[in-house]
């Protein structure tokens, strides 16, 4: 089995090849990128059991956490998930075909619809979210509560910086 190339090894290769370039940011960003990829893979283990993608889970979860009647507009989903309309449309089509949500016409506006969980979608997301939370708990198990709080604060600062400067 090939040795896993650590981010620090990659950065050292850059230092060797480009000693004139300060590649220090690569240590943090490279690690964040790797961790993000590994987290996505770990989360997908739960989603794939239910034949869901991460985005499809996010759509169902967005509807579920809004409370009864578990219906919102497509634009609210787009804003909540930071995705574009074309991505949303294909995901909604698949979730609707699976019977987990439906498009509900809005009275007085023939062009607009709300997206609503079906009873089957409600039952599904309730099952999946329980496993999802346990999976997330396992992913974060190396950290103490204090470390998780600190990590969240640090990542929150990066998130805020990126949102404010895009």
From Swiss-Prot:
The presence of PecM is required to ensure the full regulation of the pecS-pecM intergenic region by PecS. PROSITE patterns: HTH_MARR_1 (PS01117), HTH_MARR_2 (PS50995). One of its GO terms (molecular function) is DNA-binding transcription factor activity. Keywords: Cytoplasm, DNA-binding, Repressor, Transcription, Transcription regulation. Disruption phenotype: Mutants display derepressed synthesis of both pectinases and cellulases. They also produce an insoluble extracellular blue pigment, indigoidine. The survival of the mutant, in which indigoidine synthesis is derepressed, is significantly higher under oxidative stress. Mutant is much more aggressive than the wild-type strain on potted S.ionantha. It comes from the Bacteria. InterPro entries: HTH_MarR-typ, Tscrpt_reg_MarR-type_CS, WH-like_DNA-bd_sf, WH_DNA-bd_sf. One of its GO terms (biological process) is regulation of DNA-templated transcription. Induction: Negatively autoregulated. It is found in: Cytoplasm. Gene3D superfamilies: Winged helix-like DNA-binding domain superfamily/Winged helix DNA-binding domain. The keyword Transcription regulation applies. It holds the Pfam family MarR. GO terms for cellular component: cytoplasm. Residues 25-160 form the HTH marR-type domain. Its main location: cytoplasm. The keyword DNA-binding applies. Negatively regulates the expression of genes encoding pectinase and cellulase, which play a major role in virulence, and the expression of the blue pigment indigoidine, which is implicated in pathogenicity and protection from oxidative stress. Represses the expression of genes involved in indigoidine biosynthesis by binding to indA and indC promoter regions. Also binds to promoter sites in the pecS-pecM intergenic region and negatively autoregulates its expression as well as that of pecM. This is HTH-type transcriptional regulator PecS. It comes from Dickeya dadantii (strain 3937).
């Amino acid at each position: 089995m090939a040795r896993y190339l650590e981010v620090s090894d990659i950065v050292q290769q850059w230092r060797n090849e480009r000693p004139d370039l300060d590649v220090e940011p690569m240590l943090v960003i490279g690690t964040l990128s790797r961790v993000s990829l590994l987290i996505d893979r770990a989360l997908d283990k739960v989603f794939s059991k239910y034949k869901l993608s991460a985005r499809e889970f996010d759509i169902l979860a967005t509807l579920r956490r809004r409370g009864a009647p578990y219906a919102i507009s497509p634009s609210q989903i787009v804003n909540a998930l930071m995705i574009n309309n074309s991505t949303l449309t294909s995901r909604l089509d698949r979730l609707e075909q699976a019977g987990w949500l439906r498009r509900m016409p809005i009275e007085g506006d023939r062009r607009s619809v709300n997206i609503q969980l079906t009873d089957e979608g409600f039952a599904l997301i309730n099952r999946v979210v329980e496993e999802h939370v346990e999976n997330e708990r396992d992913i974060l198990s190396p950290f103490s509560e204090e470390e998780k709080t600190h990590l969240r604060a640090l990542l929150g600062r990066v998130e805020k910086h990126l949102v404010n400067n895009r």
